[in-house]
C-alpha cells in the first residue's frame, strides 16, 4: 500500500468517515478516488443519519470526488444488502480500486463482516480510527478543522436538545457518561459541513425535528427505540 493505492471511502456524511478520510490521506495510506454511500430508495436519505441526498452530493462536490450511491429498500435483509454492495465493489475493483476505507472504531463483528465482504472481490479494508480512544477522536475532529453537527439522536441515550450541537470540546464536556463520545453504538449521528479537504464550507439551514420509531426485525423488542432527526438543508441546492 502506498500513496497511489486507490481507495474507496465509505461515506456516511458524518464525522467518523471524514476523520478517517483525513487521516488516511495525511498518513499516506492511499489515495481516495471514490465515495460510497447507502441510501434509502424510498426517502433519498442516508440510512440512520437521515441526511438528504442533495447534501451528500454537495459534500462530494466540495471533495471533488465521484459519489457512488447504493439505494436500498427500507429495512433491507442481509441478502439484498450483500448483493448490492458486491456489485458495487466488483465494479470498483475493475477500475483499479483495491482498498475500502471505513470510519469504524471498535465494533469487532462489523469489521470482520466488512473484511469478509471485501475478500470476496479481492479487496482489503483500511480502518484509520480502529481502537483509538473516542474522546481523543472527538478532540482530533475539532483540532483537524472538521466541523460537524448532530442530526440524529437515539432517544434512549440523548434528548432532542442535542440536535444541532457541534462536535467539539464543549460537546465532549456535556455528553452523558453512558454515551460513547463518538456515538459508536448508534447513540447519535452527525453531518460534516466543513473539513480541510472541502473546497469551501457548506452553508446549512436547520428545519423541523422529526421523531421516528423503529422495531426490532425479529419482534423481540431488544432494540425497539425512537430517534429524533434534525432536517437540514443547503440553500445552494434548495
Regions of interest found by a model, annotated:
Residues 1-238:
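Nucleotide-activated chemistry modules centered on ATP-dependent adenylation/adenylyltransferase
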Amino acid at each position: 500500500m502506498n500513496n497511489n493505492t486507490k481507495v474507496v471511502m465509505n461515506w456516511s456524511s458524518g464525522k467518523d468517515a471524514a476523520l478517517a478520510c483525513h487521516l488516511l490521506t495525511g498518513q499516506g495510506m492511499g489515495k481516495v478516488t471514490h465515495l460510497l454511500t447507502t441510501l434509502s430508495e424510498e426517502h433519498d436519505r442516508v440510512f440512520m443519519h437521515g441526511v438528504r441526498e442533495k447534501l451528500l452530493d454537495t459534500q462530494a462536490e466540495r471533495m471533488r470526488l465521484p459519489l457512488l450511491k447504493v439505494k436500498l429498500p427500507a429495512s433491507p435483509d442481509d441478502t439484498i444488502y450483500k448483493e448490492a454492495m458486491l456489485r458495487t465493489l466488483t465494479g470498483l475493483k475493475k477500475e483499479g480500486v483495491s482498498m475500502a476505507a471505513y470510519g469504524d472504531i471498535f465494533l469487532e463483528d462489523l469489521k470482520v463482516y466488512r473484511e469478509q465482504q471485501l475478500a470476496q472481490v479481492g479487496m482489503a479494508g483500511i480502518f484509520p480510527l480502529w481502537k483509538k480512544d473516542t474522546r481523543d477522536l472527538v478532540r482530533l475532529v475539532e483540532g483537524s478543522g472538521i466541523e460537524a453537527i448532530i442530526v440524529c439522536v437515539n432517544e434512549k441515550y440523548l434528548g432532542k436538545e442535542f440536535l444541532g450541537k457541534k462536535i467539539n470540546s464543549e460537546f465532549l464536556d456535556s455528553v452523558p457518561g453512558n454515551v460513547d463520545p463518538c456515538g459508536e453504538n448508534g447513540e447519535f449521528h452527525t453531518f460534516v459541513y466543513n473539513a480541510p479537504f472541502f473546497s469551501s464550507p457548506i452553508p446549512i439551514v436547520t428545519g423541523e425535528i422529526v421523531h421516528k420509531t423503529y422495531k426490532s426485525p425479529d419482534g423481540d423488542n431488544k432494540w425497539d427505540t425512537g430517534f429524533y432527526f434534525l432536517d437540514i438543508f443547503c440553500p445552494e441546492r434548495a
